Amino acid sequence: MVKAVAVLSNSNEVSGTINFSQEGNGPTTVTGTLAGLKPGLHGFHIHALGDTTNGCISTGPHFNPNGKEHGAPEDETRHAGDLGNINVGDDGTVSFTITDNHIPLTGTNSIIGRAVVVHADPDDLGKGGHELSKTTGNAGGRVACGIIGLQG
């Protein structure tokens, strides 16, 4: 079993921890708990770079090793890092579990060293008709991020 973790934070009181685990070549399970977010849906993605030198903006675009358009997690055409939305409760907190086959912790397309990003707005899953729908899901600014690090 390979395990990884990302600790999310920013200057706006958003905080939390996201854990990743993968058994063999199976899917990766993502579990997380976050606090300090506005209630409602927030886009949730793996971004290409593990660089936070300029805050979350330095994490680059969505992780997309296959050069596809943005989509929903269940779509065949999607970025590898497209994990859809998390639904934050009225108290500003969310706990979630996601299982995904496109974000391995080992191999050529490993997400280790990349970043996980929570966005300000809902991800339209590439179906919103906005000019940004097919690249970012029109999910708005980046409100929190963390670098995905390997755990022992």
Swiss-Prot record:
EC number, as in UniProt: 1.15.1.1
Q: Where does Zn(2+) bind?
A: 62, 70, 79, 82
Any idea which UniProt keywords this protein has? Antioxidant, Copper, Cytoplasm, Disulfide bond, Metal-binding, Oxidoreductase, Zinc
Q: Name the predominant localization.
A: cytoplasm
Name the residues that bind Cu cation: 45, 47, 62, 119
How does the cofactor attach, per the note? Binds 1 copper ion per subunit. Binds 1 zinc ion per subunit.
This protein's record includes keyword Transit peptide: no
Checking Gene3D superfamilies in the record gives: Superoxide dismutase, copper/zinc binding domain (2.60.40.200)
Required cofactor names: Cu cation; Zn(2+)
- Give a short account of what the protein does: Destroys radicals which are normally produced within the cells and which are toxic to biological systems.
Can you say what this protein is called? Superoxide dismutase [Cu-Zn]
Per the UniProt entry, what species is this protein from, by scientific name?
Answer: Pisum sativum
